[in-house]
UniProtKB/Swiss-Prot annotation:
Protein name as annotated: Cytochrome c oxidase assembly protein CtaG
Periplasmic-side positions: 34-194
Function (record text): Exerts its effect at some terminal stage of cytochrome c oxidase synthesis, probably by being involved in the insertion of the copper B into subunit I.
Keywords recorded for this protein, A-Z: Cell inner membrane, Cell membrane, Copper, Membrane, Signal-anchor, Transmembrane, Transmembrane helix
Matches recorded under InterPro entries: CtaG/Cox11_dom_sf (IPR023471), Cyt_c_oxidase_assmbl_CtaG (IPR007533)
Record organism: Paracoccus denitrificans
Residue ranges, Cytoplasmic side: 1-12
Gene name, Swiss-Prot/TrEMBL: ctaG
Membrane-spanning segments: 13-33
GO molecular function, one term: copper ion binding
Family: Belongs to the COX11/CtaG family.
Length: 194
């Protein structure tokens, strides 16, 4: 009888180790899978990236509103240069956002984005966008950043998507750590030991 007990413990330990490995693998895969899922379905307002402008333009119009936010530690003023525009569905449009670095140091930031309502993400296509790369602004620098986009004509064929207004929203986040000014001052005042 004692021969069965160690084998049972070994099996239990192996199963528990397998569960731990499986949970770790699922945790690791969750983020890329969720990103892929959002891009494919437009879930959570995730937009598409298009290679070129739409070749189908309809007479039906849609209104796109623009929203901008900046993380408090960024030190930038960030705003849309126009609050909204009306365009034909399928028409290529360009909107501009303005960013000003209000600090006395270079600051690098990146923009996260989404559209509302969430269902519009599947039909909203960006061709070019400042959000595709990091942006570095020098002290006091002001830039106008374009986003080129269109709303896919398939929107009118989706009977579940009764969308006539879309909000494109960006939030800029700092990507480089703030300069440790106090540490630099402390280093200058510390006595050197020989």
């Amino acid at each position: 009888m004692s021969g069965g007990k160690p084998r049972s413990n070994t099996r239990t330990v192996a199963m528990l180790a397998g569960v731990v490995v499986l949970m770790g693998a699922l945790s690791w895969a969750a983020v890329p899978f969720y990103s892929w899922f959002c891009k494919v379905t437009g879930f959570a307002g995730t937009t598409n990236v298009a290679e070129a402008a739409s070749d189908t333009v309809l007479d039906e119009k849609i209104r796109v509103r623009f929203d901008a936010n900046a993380d408090s530690n960024l030190g930038w003023t960030f705003r849309p240069m126009q609050r909204e525009m009306e365009l034909k569905i399928g028409e290529n449009a360009i909107a501009f956002y303005e960013a000003i670095n209000n600090t006395d140091e270079p600051v690098t930031g990146t923009a996260s984005y989404n559209v509302a309502p969430d269902a519009a993400g599947y039909f909203f296509n960006k061709i070019e966008c400042f959000c595709f790369t990091e942006q570095t602004l020098q002290p006091g620098e002001r830039v106008e950043m374009p986003v080129s986009f269109f709303v896919d004509a398939d929107l009118v064929n989706d009977r579940d998507a009764v969308i006539r207004d879309i909000t494109l929203s960006y939030t800029f986040h700092r990507t480089d750590p703030p300069a440790p000014k106090q540490a630099a001052l402390d280093a200058k005042t510390e006595p050197t030991v020989n």
